[in-house]
Amino acid sequence: MSIKQWPEGERPREKLLERGAAALSDAELLAILLRVGTRGMSAVDLARYLLQEFGSLGRLMSAEVGKLSAYKGMGTASFTQFAVVREIGRRILEEELQEEITLSDPDTVADYLRFHLGQEKVEVSVALLLNRQNQLIAVRELSRGTVAENTIYIREIVKLALDEYADSLIIAHNHPGGSPEPSQEDIMFTRRLAQAMSLVDVSLLDHFIVTSQTVRSFRQLGLMP
């Protein structure tokens, strides 16, 4: 049965208009984005199938075009739509951070970092540069690559902070393997960086480790120098 044949109150679009987007399931939201299904499958059926195959909405939305294209009804058009949705979400979160980012609101920072780094397939490190009021000046990528390739030079971070006239910064990196626990190398690097930043009167406020499901804060773990 096609969605057009469903009772009006159960159709995703009509349900959204009547109850709001929060009332829809992941499959219903995805069905609105997909618009159509395939032969024998409504858009909602296709959405449910894809969510089951990929394991989560985040993994599906971050899938590469080649992997998406292996599924009937999916391809470059769907990949483009998903990429646009991800980027819009990232920019909205970045706008919120630029308006006000404070340590009293760590959830906003964690949400942004999870969205920005959580689905990366390789290790990526970023710096969030802040002014005296703890408002976001800029987000800069520090490195990208495998763990073996992902070398971050402290002097480059110091230079970046000075070039951007930052009063403080937050650094973050993802663990593609899924474990959010800081390694001994992470802890030692954070100590060395905090010491180097103090020499130029820039505060290292926190270091976050990000996975697709979890964000860990060094400050909350009691690991900040």
Curated annotation (Swiss-Prot):
GO terms for molecular function: metal ion binding; metallopeptidase activity. The keyword Translocase does not apply. Keywords: Hydrolase, Metal-binding, Metalloprotease, Protease, Zinc. A motif (JAMM motif) lies at residues 173-186. InterPro entries: MPN, RadC_JAB, RuvA_2-like, UPF0758, UPF0758_N. NCBIfam families: PRK00024.1, radc. This is UPF0758 protein NGO_0681.
